[in-house]
Amino acid sequence: MNEELSIELCHLTVGYSKKGVHLSQVHQQSNNTNQGVHLSQVHQQSNEAQQGVHLSQVHQQNNEAQRLVQLSQLHPLGARSVASDLNATALPGTLTCLIGHNGTGKSTLLRTIARLQPSIDGSVLIGDNDISTLKPTQLSRMLSIVLTSRPDVRNMTVEELVALGRAPYTGFWGRLSADDRRIVRHSIESVGITAMAERRVCTLSDGEMQKVMIAKSLAQQTPVILLDEPTAFLDFPGKIDLMLLLQRLAHEERKTILLSTHDLETALQTADRLWLLADGALHDGTPHELADRGFIDDYIGRNSVKFDKQTLSIQIL
């Protein structure tokens, strides 16, 4: 697929219920599917319901933005806002890193964008489409998400797991056509995991597993890929390799890739744009733009650390 779509947030508010219940839990029990259908429903056809991993979504043929307009994460019993009035843009062909301290709402924001949590005030647009009006199968062709949890498919081979990315296109029985198999092989090659295609998933390291899940998203052929802390639990070389891989995929395949991370310096060096969540607000810009505006210094907030705005490097004093 050659379509390109951007993400735009307009006046977005995310949060939790006042009683500490995560809104995704409330949403799963809700009968109001028009306010956000949990994409795990789509995964039931591909034996992935336990994973919480989205199937990719194939977007419409246009270059218009995905706009997320005036979203509020609310619960009938009330909600506590984590971050409000968020405005930001992620473009095709760019790697955007979402950074922020623990508890600022990074994962909540990603889950809201992916419609794993309900939206009540406002809408999410992909191109001209409000995602609340889309069927799960339509949504599963527009956006994919890789979460931190490891899928419990230990007896599958890598190729079989990647092939699940074709579920939105194969119908109920999940039979792969010759074209589906070609797309799966290409996705495996693009991520550089051809040598492990026949390995069992249970033998993979964390870094290898992340690459497999990225290949699965590529096989799903979505314009947008979301990743929640993909570099967590990886060693330093593994973090660099994975970030450079995502950067290359964004640039070469014109994907809109948005990921959350705590690895500030790696994000500064590899991201095209940053979304910085701080004090309930979202700051959007290139690494140099946010550095020049003083947001990176404020985010670090330590006298024992020196941040160089020109080189975007961090030094412990």
Question: Which residues are covered by each model-predicted region?
Answer:
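Conserved ABC ATPase signature
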Residues: 200-204
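Catalytic Walker B motif of ABC-type/P-loop ATPase nucleotide-binding domains
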Residues: 225-228
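Helix-to-loop junction immediately C-terminal to a conserved catalytic motif
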Residues: 114
